[in-house]
Amino acid sequence: MAAKLLLLLCLFSGLHARSRRVEEDDSEDSPSNQKWVLAPKSQDTDVTLILNKLLREYDKKLRPDIGIKPTVIDVDIYVNSIGPVSSINMEYQIDIFFAQTWTDSRLRFNSTMKILTLNSNMVGLIWIPDTIFRNSKTAEAHWITTPNQLLRIWNDGKILYTLRLTINAECQLQLHNFPMDAHACPLTFSSYGYPKEEMIYRWRKNSVEAADQKSWRLYQFDFMGLRNTTEIVTTSAGDYVVMTIYFELSRRMGYFTIQTYIPCILTVVLSWVSFWIKKDATPARTTLGITTVLTMTTLSTIARKSLPRVSYVTAMDLFVTVCFLFVFAALMEYATLNYYSSCRKPTIRKKKTSLLHPDSTRWIPDRISLQAPSNYSLLDMRPPPPVMITLNNSMYWQEFEDTCVYECLDGKDCQSFFCCYEECKSGSWRRGRIHIDVSELDSYSRVFFPTSFLLFNLVYWVGYLYL
């Protein structure tokens, strides 16, 4: 009896040890990570069997439902960052997660698992949409530390394919209002080879989302929002469904205000200082005028470095040009003042002819009143005063001692709007002419230049900022 009990005990001990070995064999235990890595063999075997079965007769060269109906691609994009934007190259950089979802009936499977989450090694084994970005100059997929790709397959054949891309996309900037301009930079994509009869793109709900803008590199722009569109583009190869996202950007003026606008305004104001300098200080006024003109030329060159070589006039070009004209006009004002106010020394001219000769006056009137001294002393060597002829309340001088560079009075009406001496203000001026005293030109400029520049700024800023 004791021998039978001992035999039964040995038998049960052997069965228990065997069952324990079987349980240990049903799980894989990594030697280096025994505490947290446990993968049942049966599940690995199921996934491997499912994939082998799906790919056994799968042809990745053919799109799903070929010859039956078009393949529908649902698209959504997550914008990781935007920027910088290059105005010179007319392009911008964008970092996105690009996700495409479609259904491939050839990849349906029956299993207790609903989703197969796979890595990038499976991407090359199934059909993938041939999506291209139509306005990209360069594009780069991220491969560190592994290819940034995600592939998921549902048991009903739905496939999700996601990858991370950095794209330098073209953005045609219209710089007429620069630097107060706003732009809608597009990101356009479509199929490379499948027309709309074979492939259709659709936006998913909440298809475009953006990350926190704190990490964006929009140094000179503010992000105002985005919008997406769908259109059909006709080409010689067929009609294609084209998807576009527009990123609304508005330029910040702070940089250009500091670098261009404020220096230009201060240079114009500096050129007005010459109006308060005496007109006899020719070196000081000339140096100041030439310096301000050269400064405006330098500022104009610097302002153009931030722009491509466009053929039209931008808002900044207009402002810099007008400022240059104001500075140049201030220099020309002194040149005009100096020219008309510089008189020669008085000269004494004797008339060798008498009033009896026809050449003694400009012309011979019908009634002449001659006024001259009646008696002269033989010892008085002073020249006689000039002879004056009076006709119909008009005064004509036979001789004029103060002869200026510009001769206004010589029997002719003044041909200029400027007076170079006091007698010009008398009847020798043509009636209806504007009388401007050249000696008061600085006084006029002190009012005219600031007023006109203030009016220009008022029209400029209101027109570009609010109209």
Swiss-Prot record:
InterPro entries: GABAA/Glycine_rcpt, GABBAg3_rcpt, GABRG-1/4, Neur_chan_lig-bd, Neur_chan_lig-bd_sf, Neur_channel, Neuro-gated_channel_TM_sf, Neuro_actylchol_rec
Signal peptide: 1-17
S-S bonds: C171-C185
Glycan-bearing residues: N110, N228
Subcellular location: Postsynaptic cell membrane; Cell membrane
PANTHER family from the UniProt entry: NEUROTRANSMITTER GATED ION CHANNEL
Purpose of the protein: Gamma subunit of the heteropentameric ligand-gated chloride channel gated by gamma-aminobutyric acid (GABA), a major inhibitory neurotransmitter in the brain. GABA-gated chloride channels, also named GABA(A) receptors (GABAAR), consist of five subunits arranged around a central pore and contain GABA active binding site(s) located at the alpha and beta subunit interface(s). When activated by GABA, GABAARs selectively allow the flow of chloride across the cell membrane down their electrochemical gradient.
Name the record gives this protein: Gamma-aminobutyric acid receptor subunit gamma-3
Organism of origin: Rattus norvegicus (Rat)
Lineage: Eukaryota, Metazoa, Chordata, Craniata, Vertebrata
Gene designation per UniProt: Gabrg3
